[in-house]
C-alpha cells in the first residue's frame, strides 16, 4: 500500500492511498465468506457456497464492493500511521479507482480529506515577563470572610418593611404573552440582587412589601417561549432578612476550633493571605498562557468549532443550551472553543519539547482532585472514566498542566509594586509536595486509593 499527503490548508490534508490487488485479495476472500453466509443455494450448506456460484448469483462486483467497504477503514488507519498525520475530524472518502471485477489485477485508489492538528513553531518561551497584582490582604478581607462565616450560621426573620438588596423573598410569578398566561410558579424563594431568575425582577421587587405586586417586561430565556418578550406579574408574599450571630468568643467556639474571636480572626487573616498568593499564581498562569497564544499562531480547523457549537446547542444533549441559542452566545462558544484548542496545541508542543511525562501518582492526584469537585468517591470516579475511555484524556490534561508549570517556572513575574514573585510552591507538582509531607510524617492517606508508580497497583 502506498500513501501520500497533500496539504490543502494549515489544518486540512488530502491522503492519496493506493492499495495493490495482492493487499486487496484478503479482503475479497473475506467478502466471499461474508456473502456465502448471507445467501442460500440449494445443495450447499450456508457459508459453503463456492465463489464461482456467488459470482453467478450476486455478481463479483458486489463482492468487490463488500471487500472495499469492509477494508476501507483499515487501509485508512494504515495510511494515517504511515504518513504520521493526526486527524481531528471524520474522514471524507472518495474512491477514485477500483479493480475491474472481471480481472484479477488492478488497484484500489481512494482519497481522504481530513482536518488535522496543525504543526506550530514554538518561540523561545523562557523568561516570559508578566505583571500581577500584589498579594496584599487587608482587614476588609478578614471582615468579609468573617461575615460569610456568620452568614452560614444566620437565621431568616420576617420584617414589615419594603424589600431591599440581599433580602430574602417568597414570591409568586405569572408570565403573560398577548394577554395569555403561559407560565406561573408560586412560593418561590429569591434573594434580592442575586440576578438568578428573570431580568428586571430585582428592580421590580425592590421597594415592595409583603402582599404587594409589580408588573415588568422581560425576555424569557427558557422553555417553549425562549427569546420572546413577556409581561411578568410578581407578588411578594413575604420579606425576610438574615440575622447574623454576633461576632464574639461564643461564635468562634460555635463556628471553629478556636476559643476566642481573636484566634479566629488570626486564622482568617492567614487564609486571606494564602488566598491572595493563590490568586496571584492563577493570574500569573493565565497571563503566561495569554502571552504564549500571542506569540504562536495556531490555526483552528472549522470542524473543531462547528462540532463544539453543535454539541453545545443540541437540545438532545443533556448539557445542550438550545434555549439560549443566540448569535452572541454562538460567538462566545466559538471564541472559547478556539482559545481552548490553541491552548491545547501549544501546551502539547511544549510538553513534547520538554519531554514531559505523567507518573501514576500524578494521575491519581488529578483523579482524586477531580472526583472531589464532583462530590464522588475517587475509586468510583476512576472506574467511570476508565470504562468510558477517558483515562488518556486525563493523562493529556495533567501533561498540559505540567507543561504550563514548566513555562511558568521559567517566567519573570513581578507584582504591581515591582517586587519579584516567587511561584515555586504554585508550580511545584502536587505529587512532589505530597512526598515532602510524607517524609515529614504529615501525609494523610487517601482512603482506599492506591498511590503507586507501579501501574499494576492501580485498579481503574
Swiss-Prot record:
Annotated spans, Disordered: 434-460
| GO molecular function annotations of the record | peptidyl-prolyl cis-trans isomerase activity; protein folding chaperone; ribosome binding
Instruction: Mention any one GO cellular component term assigned to this protein in its UniProt record.
Output: cytoplasm
Which Gene Ontology terms describe the biological processes this protein takes part in?
'de novo' cotranslational protein folding; cell division; chaperone-mediated protein folding; protein transport; protein unfolding
Highest taxon listed in the record's lineage:
Bacteria
Low complexity bias spans: 449-460
The reaction(s) this protein catalyses: [protein]-peptidylproline (omega=180) = [protein]-peptidylproline (omega=0)
What UniProt keywords apply to this chain's record, in alphabetical order? Answer: Cell cycle, Cell division, Chaperone, Cytoplasm, Isomerase, Rotamase
Cellular location of this protein?
Cytoplasm
* Chain ranges of the PPIase FKBP-type domain: 166-245
Q: Which cysteine pairs are covalently linked by disulfides here?
A: none
EC assignment: the record states 5.2.1.8
| Primary role | Involved in protein export. Acts as a chaperone by maintaining the newly synthesized protein in an open conformation. Functions as a peptidyl-prolyl cis-trans isomerase.
Which HAMAP family does its entry note?
A: Trigger_factor_Tig
PANTHER family in alphabetical order? TRIGGER FACTOR CHAPERONE AND PEPTIDYL-PROLYL CIS/TRANS ISOMERASE (PTHR30560), TRIGGER FACTOR-LIKE PROTEIN TIG, CHLOROPLASTIC (PTHR30560:SF3)
Family of this protein: Belongs to the FKBP-type PPIase family. Tig subfamily.
Domain characteristics, as noted in the entry? Consists of 3 domains; the N-terminus binds the ribosome, the middle domain has PPIase activity, while the C-terminus has intrinsic chaperone activity on its own.
Q: What is this protein called in UniProt?
A: Trigger factor
Q: Which organism is it from?
A: Paenarthrobacter aurescens (strain TC1)
Q: Which gene encodes it?
A: tig
